[in-house]
Design a protein with these regions (language model features):
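Rossmann-like NAD(P)-binding element
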Residues: 44-48, 52-90, 94-98
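NAD(P)+-binding Rossmann beta1-loop-alpha1 motif at the extreme N-terminus of oxidoreductases
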Residues: 1-40
Length: 98
């Protein structure tokens, strides 16, 4: 199954690694592909893909929203609301997280 994870913070990276370990195809969506943590994650998970939020939402048959609650709406807008239609969305946001 193709899983797109929107958000490259600790929650997104841990979930992406776990899904990869179960044999799933994973794309980690980030606003900053050159971020040190993201590059380290990619080195440790060479089968994982990196992309923009929009690339990730298009890629995933399942979409995991793993961003802070205060930026969730912006992340969905950047991903393109149309890419969420008829897909399973797992929302891990926390309304008090930045």
């Amino acid at each position: 199954m193709k899983i797109g994870i929107i958000g490259s913070g600790i929650v997104g990276r841990v979930l992406a690694t776990a899904f990869i370990s179960e044999g799933e195809e994973v794309m980690l969506g980030t606003r900053n592909i050159s971020k040190e943590e993201v590059l380290k994650w990619q080195q440790e998970n060479p089968s994982g893909l990196l992309g923009s939020f929009q690339d990730t939402a298009q890629f995933g048959e399942i979409i995991v929203l793993a961003v802070g609650g205060l930026v969730a709406e912006d992340a969905i807008t950047l991903a393109g609301k149309e890419h969420f239609i008829d897909k399973v969305v797992i929302d891990t946001t926390n309304p008090i997280a930045a």
